[in-house]
A protein has these predicted regions:
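Active-site clefts of carbohydrate-active enzymes
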Residues: 103-116, 137-151
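A short, flexible beta-alpha/helix-coil linker loop
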Residues: 6-10, 72, 111-114, 147
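Active-site groove signature of glycoside hydrolases
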Residues: 1-13, 32-45, 141
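C-terminal helical cap(s) of enzyme catalytic domains, especially alpha/beta-barrels
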Residues: 151-167
Length: 167
């Protein structure tokens, strides 16, 4: 089950609340053979160092992360989680590396492509090297959030890019 760690934007409130909530949820899910996965998805959860600290404190095998290549905005103009302009972004490569030890899945986010089929915001060879160097062998989901291609075309372009990078 994928969850978000929303709530307070204040680390001293967010961290203990996140640990407590995840421990309770993961404990309930454990006997049911269910993994709880947290996506970096705005606010403090997009600060990979903080999210990794939460994962360390939870310390349960069935609780992990879903690193999303495109969700490292930690502060937005309007103070919201998703909609307004990003003012502060955590380094996506550093963040992915910090979240990979806990990864139960990976989200390959894409927005736009150049003429050669490369994603214009994310260096896919670099970020996939981080994923592979972590020893990850699980699923890589595709998430297209661009507007230049249809949803299907964007997903297929991302899949093609991943296949090329992983050759």
């Amino acid at each position: 089950i994928r969850v978000n760690l929303n709530g307070s934007m204040e680390p001293e409130v967010w961290t203990p609340a996140s640990v407590a909530g995840l421990k309770q949820l993961a404990t309930y899910a454990k006997d049911k053979n269910i993994n709880i996965i947290v996506e970096n998805h705005g606010g403090p959860s997009s600060n990979a160092q903080m999210l990794a600290e939460v994962m360390d404190k939870v310390g349960m095998e069935n609780c992990g992360t879903l690193p999303d290549f495109g969700n490292f905005c930690i502060k937005r103009e309007e103070g919201d989680y998703y909609s307004s302009k990003c003012l502060e972004e955590y380094d996506r490569y550093k963040g992915t590396k910090e979240l990979m030890p806990y990864a139960k899945g990976v989200s390959a986010k894409s927005y736009s492509f150049d003429e050669a089929g490369n994603e214009t915001r994310v260096d896919y060879p670099r970020i996939m090297e981080i994923v592979l160097d972590a020893g990850y062998e699980g699923f890589v989901g595709v998430e297209y959030e661009g507007s230049e291609l249809s949803e299907e075309e964007g997903i297929l372009a991302t899949k093609k890019l991943l296949e090329r990078v992983l050759e």
